[in-house]
């Protein structure tokens, strides 16, 4: 046969390329125009190369095995067919070699069906594995760590945000309290605000050593009274006497007792009223000695019938304690007899007391009558002219201001107080932080004593002042983020213990309870005492036992926690992100966008301002935005996620009465006896304890339930089960793809060069 002879000629040729050239021709002959391509018939029949693979002769097989063969010499389509067939023989994937080496069509068809069935099962199981991976499921690992837990930051606030004696000097606050008094009077059905008191005077026409000067009698509801000094025309000495007073002596004594108890804020009717009687008796005994003329400079004068008239001179010009809501002017003394001084305490009615042995802290400016009746007065503005004020008729406030206060239609006292607290926050927002701090309690006034781990605290250094819109000045213990405080043991003796003093006599009329507000939080978190705080009443030891739980959450795609500490529009600068802060920031941004001003209860960004408390339009806009966020679709406008790292403190509260009767010690800086100090601190003081119940804490850590490693393991198992494919088998398919892509690119490049050469030849022939 000719093909056998051609193969044997290879043995007689020293150059293999020459033999290939003789058998197959020049491999580059197809690039020449005159050279004819080898046809398929010539390739398989004339040259006989294709018959070699079907020959079973040993000689032929041996020559084929030992002979060198270059598949690049084959045409492109035959080269691809040869390459794929070679891959079927060599691949490590199960089933594919059986298809390629099948001896007949039926055998090959069976293996094709089996292979396709396995591929379908692989697809279904692989889809299940991928779905499980894409669900991004997570698990929570709970660990109980027996280690020293870091002590949290403790923020302490007085339940009374501002001192009544100082806050009432702010005009907007005074107007707010006046509107509050009017609303409370209407809600309680009080009809006595415009009723004049019955004034009865004694008629000592000839003063005698045993005759007492005119004493004020009357009835009055002082639940909303607020005093301020004012000028008025008065009658002093015999000018103000009346025969009717002697007839009503017994009846009016009872009314005087009731009235004075209300004014002086007396709680203990048996003990403190006796002291008040002693004060009255002493005051009027002095008059018995001094009343030797028709008019004494130090005696009390009457102004109920003359307060509408302008004084005519020095003899009838008095300063009276005036209440705008009731038009009461009492007591009245001549102008030169009042003394400008400082008082120890002032209550919500602006009534002040001097020489209070149990009082401690800031002294308030006041003006005192000879009878020791004192009224808060800072001297910045002159006293009101009562006759001018009353000639204008019943005082009418600006309707827009009353509308902004929001008291219209309210009949529930609790709701009115709540609205008044909000109005106070709005009014205080007009002041700077320094002014608000000045009107509120100082850290030395609130915290008398302090200890941590059994050692005394440095109150000035260990407490940081923070101004809260709802509670005024608050003080944070353990505020230094670079210092890590820990309790050396569990129990109250090794935690934080504080003796606090609230000075209930200087409370605002909107403050409903006496005590302090305590917030337990991380150093990096804003305290939010109005939301997360705990109230500790006066007269008790309030023990707060702590348990710490640390959370570590996974960010996207496993969760939606906030990983970076804060969001871009977070309004609480220098503090870490929290869910409550996020909602408040979202609400504030909404208010700023739609109302052009911010809610005074929350901070505002730079270049923004708070809404005016007296602006009814702004207040309505704020209320509308609050209703929007509290409605059905409010949660869709503010989406706030949990932080990725969070410390949660579980608190257990237990109280006990304090101080005990056996605690006969000088508490704080009280100057009275031990019994007096105990009684005073029971009404104005409290002991607060914050400690860990156990020196261990829980760690809750989220981790991925099905990670990428699990995906590879399960997916590889499915490939091996159904197709016998491993990672190396996958690499075989990758290389097959790369090789075929390279052959296609090489073939296309050869065609491109050929066309380019033909084009150049045509151009060259055309030039001749």
Curated annotation (Swiss-Prot):
UniProt cross-references to Pfam families, sorted A to Z: ASC, Mec-4_10_cyt
Transmembrane segments: 110-130, 719-739
Disulfide bonds: none
InterPro entries per UniProt: Deg-1, ENaC, ENaC_CS, Mec-4/10_cyt
Extracellular topological domain: 131-718
Biased composition (Basic and acidic residues): 189-200
Region of interest (Disordered), residue spans: 184-219
Tissue: Expressed in AVM, ALM, PVM and PLM touch neurons.
Alphabetical keyword list: Cell projection, Glycoprotein, Ion channel, Ion transport, Membrane, Neurodegeneration, Potassium, Potassium transport, Sodium, Sodium channel, Sodium transport, Transmembrane, Transmembrane helix, Transport
Glycosylation sites: 335, 356, 480, 484, 503, 671
Main location, first listed in the record: membrane
Localization (cell): Membrane; Cell projection, Axon
Cytoplasmic topological domain residue ranges: 1-109, 740-768
Top-rank taxon, per record: Eukaryota
Membrane topology listed for this record: Multi-pass membrane protein
Gene3D superfamilies according to UniProt: Acid-sensing ion channels like domains, YojJ-like
Molecular function in Gene Ontology: ligand-gated sodium channel activity
Family indicated by similarity: Belongs to the amiloride-sensitive sodium channel (TC 1.A.6) family.
Functional note: Subunit of an amiloride-sensitive cation channel (degenerin channel complex) permeable for sodium, potassium, lithium and N-methylglucamine, and required for mechanosensory transduction (touch sensitivity). Negatively regulates the turning step of male mating behavior.
Assembly information from the UniProt record: Component of a non-voltage-gated amiloride-sensitive cation channel complex (also called the degenerin channel complex) composed of at least the mec-2, mec-4, mec-6 and mec-10 subunits; the complex mediates mechanotransduction in touch cells. Interacts with mec-2, mec-6 and mec-10.
Name of the protein: Degenerin mec-4
Gene designation per UniProt: mec-4
